[in-house]
Curated annotation (Swiss-Prot):
Alphabetized InterPro entries for the sequence: Cellulose_deg_GH3, Fn3-like, Glyco_hydro_3_C, Glyco_hydro_3_C_sf, Glyco_hydro_3_N, Glyco_hydro_3_N_sf, Glycoside_hydrolase_SF, Ig-like_fold
Keywords: Carbohydrate metabolism, Cellulose degradation, Glycoprotein, Glycosidase, Hydrolase, Polysaccharide degradation, Secreted, Signal
Keyword RNA-binding: no
Pathway: Glycan metabolism; cellulose degradation
Protein name stated in the entry: Probable beta-glucosidase M
Gene3D superfamilies: Glycoside hydrolase family 3 C-terminal domain (3.40.50.1700), Glycoside hydrolase, family 3, N-terminal domain (3.20.20.300), Immunoglobulins (2.60.40.10)
Catalysed conversion reaction: Hydrolysis of terminal, non-reducing beta-D-glucosyl residues with release of beta-D-glucose
Catalytic-site annotation from UniProt: 290
Species in which this protein is naturally found: Neosartorya fischeri (strain ATCC 1020 / DSM 3700 / CBS 544.65 / FGSC A1164 / JCM 1740 / NRRL 181 / WB 181)
Family designation: Belongs to the glycosyl hydrolase 3 family.
Main location (coarse class): secreted
Length: 769
């Protein structure tokens, strides 16, 4: 890493979250010069090394780029218009048989086209806690992208991580925990790219709110994008962590975000791009802007930006001019082009790939070629994925599974299907608290997807009723419906919506809560299903004696109803666990409930100070000793599991810092050295088979009480016992040393906790380093 700051000066800047200095307290500053220097400069931009599995792709790319004219190199670095419906395009170079690139939304399935599937969302996969599911979903989903001529998936999402409870895009990512997010993004990147489609992991980095995410104008006054101000320790231990796992898995591209980081825009921040991503993590692919996130010309290129989407007004011929006048090295343009072409070769897209955009019509309602993306082989993964992301959080007196009901009463707006499915479904110009006209199976914005169909809960319930001879009464519009007193169960469906572009107006809504309470006041067996695009607090009615069962159904995709009925009737056993903490009341999230808003003196340059450090979600609840409604990692089953036999291996003797080594993709390879192995036994003590997520938490000296550092989802037959093992590597047991700029093992006693959730940990032990 090269910088014009010495190590001591660098560490000083990074030790605490950055803020603008010496600003007047009583009036808005009108220049961001107060904020200069808060993000350390790191230059030059390192060239891709072609390390490890990238060697062959880099050799081919260098040969390819050597044949390009300056104009052709420049054209690779910015999007262009094309006669297709791709989100973005890179122009072809016909004389060298390069067909161009089609990049398209998004990480939860293709958007804006036909003959594709609506997959379970990232949050839904996070709630499954299944690495195997994450990989299979990625494989089958990527096959649809490939058949439709998409070279690059604009996903998966690990930013936002979920710092702000009301953040509008938390549903696109996997979890509020970096370890869980990192494990699932690794499988997602690995799975998608195994079928020859590149991933663009996003949004890098600290894109933790939608409010003021972009610069804007209010009453004719320019307002900058919000600045996420963070210290180096928190950056590494929380927000960079899952991106490191994505790079380790070989993500071909990283999308830089709209926001500023320590008062430097994310797509021209040399510290995050040159320093962290390309130097420390050894990233071999290319950095792509989010749409319209370019705010600088040559400065952005020098800071590590490689590709602008969807087009550029500041690069083009200006890049070659900059090389001519010496403000940019020719090697930087070469590296940009090499990284892009190397990723194309790395995905083997030079061989037998569909034409870019072949199945992406500009208008689905105009004549176009039929290109089928869906495959019959995906059906099992679609349904399994939909099932496993449901989390059962209450089940009084075994209300579920249903037992041959004679009469079911169904209530709530969320039970019914949509009136229409369109090309850009669920892109709204505002963010309502709920989708009151139909069931919620996906969130809004660019992360939405196109469904082949939507199996709504009421439709699936009717099909099952036909098979069983059950009567079904329903009222899907009233807030205070009539209830037949002889009904076996009342099924109430509500939702909680979220979308790109807006943060949520709250974590609950009065009309939905009133519906639940009104039904529960008349029905002794009220079962509530919530399709939630993020945290939903339910303290208003969760303790009602007639609310017997509650399911967080998240965003299951097109097989929503079918999956739910499998669970309601016991043909599938709930196995999901919460990937976030549900508070008893919204105020328990404290300062991390709402997004940061512009305040004097920074009204024109909004600031969001990450002063809480690593203490978000369950770490914050543990630190403040707040009892949640349902803790991180919690989820019920139709059976029960018993834990025993904790074993901890003797730790491998290791120096405080990892030995020096050539940086590979993912960083210093010694970070992955195995240090300790923990094992335990899980017994199914119930009468039916089920799947349990065994969770390992570590208490690192001088750190939070507990941090997730392992999980395994295991299927266990009734009465059977299985062993789970957790292999802990050096990074798992380290904290970030801001002075040494290294991951550091701590000297002292490490606490070990194994169990069902972050607060139900029957097995405890320790080891010493």
């Amino acid at each position: 890493m090269h910088s014009n700051l010495g190590l001591a000066g660098l560490a000083g800047l990074l030790a605490t979250a950055s803020v603008c200095l010496s600003a007047p307290a009583d009036q808005n500053i009108t220049s961001d010069t107060y904020c200069y220097g808060q993000s350390p400069p790191v230059y030059p931009s390192p060239e891709g090394s072609g390390t490890g599995s990238w060697a062959a792709a880099y050799a081919k790319a260098k040969n390819f780029v050597a044949q390009l004219t300056p104009e052709e190199k420049v054209n690779l670095t910015a999007g262009t218009d094309a006669n297709n419906g791709c989100s973005g395009n890179i122009a072809a170079i016909p004389r060298l048989n390069f067909p161009g690139l089609c990049v398209s939304d998004a990480g939860n399935g293709l958007r804006g086209t036909d003959y594709v599937s609506s997959w379970p969302s990232g949050l839904h996969v996070g709630a499954s806690w299944s690495k195997a599911l994450a990989k299979q979903r990625a494989i089958h989903m990527a096959k649809e992208f490939r058949k439709k001529g998409v070279n690059v998936i604009l996903g998966p999402v690990v930013g936002p991580l979920g710092r702000v409870a009301e953040a509008g895009r938390n549903w696109e990512g996997f979890s509020n925990d970096p370890y869980l997010s990192g494990a699932l993004v690794y499988e997602t990147v690995d799975g998608a790219q195994s079928v020859g489609v590149a991933t663009c992991t996003k949004h890098y980095i600290l894109n933790e709110q939608e409010t003021n995410r972009n610069p804007g104008t209010e009453d004719g006054v320019d307002i900058a994008a919000v600045s996420s101000n963070i210290d180096d320790k928190t950056m590494h231990e929380l927000y960079l962590w899952p991106f490191q796992d994505a790079v380790l898995a070989g993500s071909a591209s990283i999308m830089c975000s709209y926001n500023r980081v320590n008062n430097s825009y994310g797509c021209q921040n040399s510290k995050t791009l040159n320093g962290l991503l390309k130097t420390e993590l050894g990233f071999q692919g290319y950095v792509m802007t989010d749409w319209g996130a370019q705010h600088a010309g040559i400065a952005g290129a020098n800071a590590g930006l490689d590709m602008v989407m969807p087009s550029t007004e500041t690069w083009g011929a200006n890049l070659t001019t900059a090389i001519s006048n010496g403000t940019m090295d020719a090697s930087r343009l070469d590296d940009m082009a090499i990284r892009i072409i190397a990723s194309w070769y790395q995905m083997n897209q030079n061989s037998d790939s569909p034409s870019p955009g072949v199945g992406m019509p500009t208008n689905m309602y105009a004549p176009h070629q039929r290109v089928i993306g869906r495959e019959a082989s995906s059906k099992q993964t679609l349904l399994r994925g939909a099932i496993e992301g449901h989390v059962l959080v209450k089940n009084t007196n075994s209300a579920l599974p249903l037992k041959s009901p004679q009469l079911l009463s169904v209530f709530g707006y969320d039970a019914k299907g949509p009136d229409a499915l369109k090309q850009n479904f669920n892109w709204l110009s505002y963010s309502p608290a709920i989708q009151e006209n139909h069931t919620l199976w996906v969130g809004g914005g660019s992360g939405a997807n196109n469904a082949a169909y939507v199996d709504a809960p009421i439709d699936a319930i009717k099909r099952q009723a036909y098979e069983d001879g059950t009567s079904v009464l329903y009222d899907l519009s009233s807030e205070d419906p009539d209830v037949d007193p002889t009904t076996d169960a009342c099924l109430v469906f509500i939702n909680s919506y979220a979308t790109e572009g807006w943060d949520r107006p709250g974590l609950a809504d009065k009309s939905s809560d009133s519906l639940v309470k009104n039904v529960a006041g008349k029905c002794a067996n009220t079962i509530v299903t919530i399709h939630n695009a993020g945290i939903r607090v339910i303290g208003d009615w969760i303790d009602h004696e007639n609310v017997t069962a509650v399911i967080f159904a998240h965003l299951p995709g097109q097989d929503s109803g079918r999956a739910l009925v499998e669970l309601l009737y016991g043909r599938a056993n709930p196995s999901g666990k919460l990937p976030y903490t549900v508070a008893k009341k919204a105020e328990d999230y404290g300062s991390l409930l709402h997004p940061s808003l512009p305040e004097t003196p920074y009204g024109l340059f909004p600031q969001s100070d990450f002063d809480e450090g690593v203490y978000i979600d369950y770490r914050a609840f543990d630190k403040a000793n707040i009892t949640p409604q349902f803790e991180f990692g919690f989820g019920l089953s139709y059976t029960a599991f018993e834990y025993s036999g904790l074993r901890i291996s003797n730790p491998k003797k290791s120096p405080q810092y990892p030995p020096s080594a050539a940086i590979q993709q993912g960083g210093n390879p010694h970070l992955w050295d195995k240090t300790v192995t923990v094992s335990a036994e899980v017994k199914n003590t119930g009468r039916v088979a089920g799947a349990e997520v065994a969770q390992l938490y570590i208490g690192i000296p001088n750190g939070p009480v507990r941090q997730l550092r392992g999980f395994e989802k295991v299927d266990v037959s009734a009465g059977e016992t299985t062993q789970v093992k957790f292999a802990l590597n050096r990074r798992d047991l380290s904290t970030w040393d801001v002075e040494a700029q290294q991951w550091s093992l701590q000297r002292g006693t490490y606490r070990v906790y194994v169990g069902r959730s972050s607060r139900d940990l029957p097995l405890t032990g320790s080891f010493t380093l």
